[in-house]
Amino acid sequence: MLQAMRAHFPIGISPRKVSKVGPRFHAHLSARGKRYRYRANLGWAMPQDERFVLSMKNTILDGEKMQLAANILTGKHDYSAFSASHGKEDTESPVKHIWRFDLVSKGKSIDFVIEGGGFLYKMVRSMVGALLDVGTGKLSPSDIKCILESRKRTEVVVSAPAHGLCLDKVFYKRILG
């Protein structure tokens, strides 16, 4: 069944597992959280097999400061400053819980791994964009704290491009058929 499903998905999207679920299961409403992975390639050439990465040729990033900033963004906070408004602000709470925000180096690339119970529109890309600015010295970890506490989106927060972002996993409540 998994192979048959894969034939209907576009290139780059590949389901890994199929499970039988009950009639009350809802793909969105039954989810308890998600893991996003954002990959930036710091080398000169893009790997041929990785189409979904941000290319930052020959960029040097301060990983220690970026992880400090990621730690500030971890926890339960109002993430309004890291959301791009798109009309849901009256119905969706800006308070979200980020369980994990880690930076994982893999050769010439760096993965931003973010897990949480919910996300606002463009929140992950905005947080990654802010951390990239910390890594290049445009912002400091204390700037990230001030931005988070301000609860206001400003031009200082620039969203990272979409092509580095991947929904890596959806965490579900126990789902039995």
Each predicted region: which residue ranges?
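Structured-RNA-binding interfaces characteristic of tRNA pseudouridine synthases
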Residues: 1-177
